[in-house]
Amino acid sequence: MNWMILLWITLGIVIGIAIGFFIARKTMMSYLKKNPPINEQMLRVMLMQMGQNPSQKKINQMMKAMQKQQSK
C-alpha cells in the first residue's frame, strides 16, 4: 500500500513537470512572436527613422551595449 502512494505521487510530479514545461514553452514562443529580439537590420531602420546616418561601427556599438545590458 505504501509503494502505491509513492508511485502515484511520483507519477503526479512527472506529469506536472511535463505539463509545466509545455505551458512555459508555448508562453515563451508567443512572447517571442509578439516581441522579437532586435537585430542589426532593425537598428539600422530605427536610426534612419530618427534621421541619423547608421554606420556599421555605430550599429556594432549599439548591439554590444544592448547585449551587455541584457547580460546583467
Curated annotation (Swiss-Prot):
Residues passing through the membrane, by range? 3-23
Recorded source organism is: Halalkalibacterium halodurans (strain ATCC BAA-125 / DSM 18197 / FERM 7344 / JCM 9153 / C-125) (Bacillus halodurans)
Belongs to which family?
Belongs to the UPF0154 family.
Q: What is its main location?
A: membrane
The record's subcellular location field reads: Membrane
- Output this protein's name: UPF0154 protein BH2350
InterPro entries reported in the protein's UniProt record: UPF0154
UniProt KW keywords: Membrane, Transmembrane, Transmembrane helix
